Amino acid sequence: METKGYHSLPEGLDMERRWSQVSQTLERSSLGPAERTTENNYMEIVNVSCVSGAIPNNSTQGSSKEKHELLPYIQQDNSRSGILPSDIKTELESKELSATVAESMGLYMDSVRDAEYTYDQQNQQGSLSPTKIYQNMEQLVKFYKENGHRSSTLSAMSRPLRSFMPDSAASMNGGALRAIVKSPIICHEKSSSVSSPLNMASSVCSPVGINSMSSSTTSFGSFPVHSPITQGTSLTCSPSVENRGSRSHSPTHASNVGSPLSSPLSSMKSPISSPPSHCSVKSPVSSPNNVPLRSSVSSPANLNNSRCSVSSPSNNTNNRSTLSSPTASTVGSIGSPISNAFSYATSGASAGAGAIQDVVPSPDTHEKGAHDVPFPKTEEVEKAISNGVTGPLNIVQYIKSEPDGAFSSSCLGGNSKISPSSPFSVPIKQESSKHSCSGASFKGNPTVNPFPFMDGSYFSFMDDKDYYSLSGILGPPVPGFDGSCEDSAFPVGIKQEPDDGSYYPEASIPSSAIVGVNSGGQSFHYRIGAQGTISLSRSPRDQSFQHLSSFPPVNTLVESWKPHGDLSSRRSDGYPVLEYIPENVSSSTLRSVSTGSSRPSKICLVCGDEASGCHYGVVTCGSCKVFFKRAVEGQHNYLCAGRNDCIIDKIRRKNCPACRLQKCLQAGMNLGARKSKKLGKLKGLHEEQPQQPPPPPPQSPEEGTTYIAPTKEPSVNSALVPQLTSITHALTPSPAMILENIEPETVYAGYDNSKPDTAESLLSTLNRLAAKQMIQVVKWAKVLPGFKNLPLEDQITLIQYSWMCLSSFALSWRSYKHTNSQLLYFAPDLVFNEEKMHQSAMYELCQGMRQISLQFVRLQLTFEEYSIMKVLLLLSTVPKDGLKSQAAFEEMRTNYIKELRKMVTKCPNSSGQSWQRFYQLTKLLDSMHDLVSDLLEFCFYTFRESQALKVEFPAMLVEIITDQLPKVESGNAKPLYFHRK
């Protein structure tokens, strides 16, 4: 029967029920640009052959049996070029034929839709493919036979699907055209390659007429498979192809053509429709080899790099195309039921880098309010592309959100789960905590700091009392000091650890250390810095002497402290010193008397390297020794390229010779200096003299006398009493000698010269330096003769009241020795000139400390005088109510005043002027109280406003100031003056 196509045909899916829900689709065609008007809508002539018995009658089982009998076919004839208007039949005949076909389709759909209507579920899984899969299914649709027309239109209804309209096709055809071809079938099973011979009538495109084609996408279950035009590119014919009167749409004549694929919800009313769940139409689609096509699936070399969704059957023999002609392409990429079931479709040479679905909604989709089609989950499979090259499309990967079972079990273990709120859809591999230091952090447990000394706080194995308070540092009180040999003032020898770089002049060194003594008599020395050391002292020994009630033996103090670098000319470096000699010692014991433990290694006071000895009056390394000698003897005039404050250390000591020479001079190096050997007189004590006459030679038997054994050797008590008396007098150390040996080492401030000098940074550096110096002061007071006789509470009180006085007095001494009182020598790496004094916000106080240093220059103060005066300053401030053991304190202070008087009298240049010098020295001690009062006032102010001023206070100073501040402000502190004001 021959009929004419009509504008709008109802859908074949239960026409009466769905008529109001289906949108109208208009297809327009034209023969040429001049003939196109709004009324010039010609319908194509199609020849339909109704096969009898193709439609079963309400029998689901019968349809299953007849599925193998009916096969669709569509043939295309290229012999004619167009359709004449005289061949158009009446519209009434077309409507009658359409009604007959629709009624037949409706009868079948009523019988099978309840049993096999699963379209919605399969559509959400992405089961859409225009492929040849239903060879065993029943032919349910009438096909148009070849009737000599040039072109025909096949439009099979499928589930609403997203249209693919790439920009390249729009720009090529002059606009965003709507495709006139819809993917003809909906797949629920495995699909195979769609093929069509060249002689078949194509329902998809004609050789010259069709310029744009949309595509659909399918997937087998959860496995994505590309349809003939999966990649989202339109079937585009060359614009230069001549339009030979085809009724197909061209870009210039069909701008308003409604597309079945332009919107997912638009339904083309086609005279032929396939049921959603049973695709019984073979859709052989072919593109003739004479049309230059653009393919996003296969792009062989002879296709002029054009895009096409359908491979040319004659020129695509070696490409794996999504749609292939059976005569040319033997390898179809759309998986057939046999070869490619449950597998990924193989992309062509330009199909992209993986099995990716590019779902791009068309503009029509949003205009018509379509619901989004769920994106199928895809994942990129390694080696899924045989010879793939990334295509020109912007491929979007939708990563699978659910973690794979094998992956999660291998990475996270059996009990690992992914939190639904986790920002990562793919689980992150977590190492087991058995051999991992971070395992505890994953479980929520706090991790232990492997480097506790970097914390900046005080660390100790003792309780808080031991390492935060002065009582812990000073240790428990000892028995009374009565001068006997059995009771010593020093029950515990303080061991100074080898200098391992804690005093290294680096800015990065933390600022504190701690020394403590626990109840067991062990002293702990912690340096909180780049190097952390813990030292345990030796066990207590009996260290006493006979004839001096206030001072311990020399060797004890020599072992307890390292020699001071600046005072090494007055030390007994390298010379043995004898301890006291007990009464029951034998002569052989004297031979074995040594100096005790060997001295620890020293550091160079210039560069911080390991010192090789005392060179030119200063403990330095060999490199600095040679440098200083050559610089002074050669009279070099070095100039600093910076600000004369370069860092001189082991690595950078050769960078700036000017700053290195300046540091050598500040350390006290002098070519004329020679090492003093004050204790050299003790050297001869090691050479033992014959203490007993040799025994008489035995008489020979010839003389007739009987050999008599020698009498018992006299006891030590009787034989060595006279010699021990003289030795003891020779070994009696003077207080000045003891104070010299216990003088603390030089402490570095750790000042960073690279940062700009501000009041906050300078004051914070001074506070950190003061905390370090307080450790040295406590160690010094601990071994001070007579100080351990005082109760522990009195010791703490005296240190709290006098710490500022001791620090400023020591600063004046260093400034006097190193800069001749021209600068304030706080530390080797922190020297204040006039500029820094102004920047520190304490210029007047700095000038006051400098005036004290200038008094040292005027008086030419000696170290012996300085050391005794410093002890008197420790004992110069007491509570207003007195100490707990005031009598012991008064006795100790009186002894040191007498020692100062003796020292002044022994001075060789003070004949006749000793009393005057003693007066001047005591007046200098009185002047320290006025200076310290101003310093404490400034210190307390910065302590209260430390948060606002951004000034740091170490824990040691915080403890001392917290206890001292209320006592001083309440007037409980009482300074002791030598002279009335």
UniProtKB/Swiss-Prot annotation:
Keywords: Cytoplasm, DNA-binding, Endoplasmic reticulum, Lipid-binding, Membrane, Metal-binding, Nucleus, Phosphoprotein, Receptor, Steroid-binding, Transcription, Transcription regulation, Zinc, Zinc-finger
Localization per Swiss-Prot or TrEMBL: Cytoplasm; Nucleus; Endoplasmic reticulum membrane
Annotated residues for binding of aldosterone: 767, 773, 814, 942
Tissue: Detected in liver, brain, heart, kidney, colon, aorta, hippocampus, hypothalamus and adrenal fasciculata.
DNA-binding region per UniProt: 604-669
Changes after translation: Phosphorylated.
Zinc finger (NR C4-type): 604-624, 640-664
Modification Phosphoserine, positions: 250, 259, 283, 287, 299
Effect of mutating residue 645 to R: Lowers homodimerization and decreases receptor activity
Positions of Zn(2+) 2 binding: 640, 646, 656, 659
Taxonomy of the source species: Eukaryota, Metazoa, Chordata, Craniata, Vertebrata
Any one GO MF annotation of this record: identical protein binding
Its biological purpose: Receptor for both mineralocorticoids (MC) such as aldosterone and glucocorticoids (GC) such as corticosterone or cortisol. Binds to mineralocorticoid response elements (MRE) and transactivates target genes. The effect of MC is to increase ion and water transport and thus raise extracellular fluid volume and blood pressure and lower potassium levels.
Domain NR LBD positions: 723-961
Subunit: Heteromultimeric cytoplasmic complex with HSP90, HSP70, and FKBP4, in the absence of ligand. After ligand binding, it translocates to the nucleus and binds to DNA as a homodimer and as a heterodimer with NR3C1. Binds the coactivator NCOA2. May interact with HSD11B2 in the absence of ligand. Binds the coactivators NCOA1, TIF1 and NRIP1.
GO process annotations (BP): angiotensin-activated signaling pathway; cellular response to aldosterone; intracellular sodium ion homeostasis; locomotory behavior; nuclear receptor-mediated corticosteroid signaling pathway; nuclear receptor-mediated steroid hormone signaling pathway; positive regulation of non-canonical NF-kappaB signal transduction; positive regulation of transcription by RNA polymerase II
UniProt binding sites for progesterone: 767, 773, 814, 942
Organism: Rattus norvegicus
Protein known as: Mineralocorticoid receptor
Biased composition (Pro residues): 691-700
Main location: cytoplasm
Region (Hinge) location: 670-722
